[in-house]
Amino acid sequence: MTISQETLERLAADLRRAEQQGEAIPPLRDAIGAENGEAAYAIQRLNVAHALAAGRRLVGRKVGLTNPKVQAQLGVDQPDFGCLFADMAYGDNETVPFDRVLQPKIEREIALVLERDLPARTPTWPNVANRHRLGACRPLEIVGTVSPTWNIRFADTVADNASSGLFVLGGPARRLDGLDLRGAAMRMTRNDELVSSGSGAECLGHPLNAAVWLARTLARLGDPLKAGDIVLTGALGPMVAVNAGDRFDAEIDGLGRVGVTFSQS
């Protein structure tokens, strides 16, 4: 399905307006097709350009759809990615306004912080996994959607910045030496009750697989990852709905604990 530039710009503006007003809108796939990744990424790029023109600062990327069960649910066989901006970041144990993200859910992930630029050519696993290029830290990602009741398909989440809302970053980053990112167990509680668990193996088999996929994808687009970029590699367990006033704490073996509280309104 070929989508006109005028339609892409209108849909991008619809997304921005929905996010600003905190109101759900009909799924974008109704206009572009459920699996039209090309149009969906074009809409995402339009809104990223709008954000940069407004003075927002790009600090990294997120990888989504890294769990095979989620891929099967949405009928896709690949991850997607979105952009992280500085004004989306919160620190460990900070309070997040509940209304900052529409229909919020939360995921526990592994974040990688680049200490050196990645090659502009197609990066390899050794390029990405080089211990001198990476540090690892503990994030929570708060995702959301403008589609009613999380009724989304591939095109909907891609266009909507891969459903990215906010992220909480616990630090400082630590070297990869001695870390078993694949086998690391994750546990997340909501108000002291266990609500999500998993391991690094649930993120494309290994969190570094997600990072390599992202690095190669961005290199092909002529926008390689740079020193200082943050990469959220994908959920290690099921995402969990957030209610006003909730407190979440999550721990990953070897990386430690990170927490966040949501305001009452």
From Swiss-Prot:
It holds the Pfam family FAA_hydrolase. InterPro entries: Fumarylacetoacetase-like_C, Fumarylacetoacetase_C_sf, Hydratase-Decarb/MhpD_sf, Keto_pentenoate-hydratase. Its cofactor is a divalent metal cation. GO terms for cellular component: cytoplasm. Its EC number is 4.2.1.80. One of its GO terms (biological process) is 3-phenylpropionate catabolic process. Keywords: Aromatic hydrocarbons catabolism, Lyase. It is an enzyme of class 4 (lyase). It comes from the Bacteria. It catalyses: (S)-4-hydroxy-2-oxopentanoate = (2Z)-2-hydroxypenta-2,4-dienoate + H2O. The keyword Lyase applies. One of its GO terms (molecular function) is 2-oxopent-4-enoate hydratase activity. Pathway: Aromatic compound metabolism; 3-phenylpropanoate degradation. Gene3D superfamilies: Fumarylacetoacetase-like, C-terminal domain (3.90.850.10). Belongs to the hydratase/decarboxylase family. MhpD subfamily. Catalyzes the conversion of 2-hydroxypentadienoic acid (enolic form of 2-oxopent-4-enoate) to 4-hydroxy-2-ketopentanoic acid. This is 2-keto-4-pentenoate hydratase 1. It comes from Pseudomonas putida (Arthrobacter siderocapsulatus).
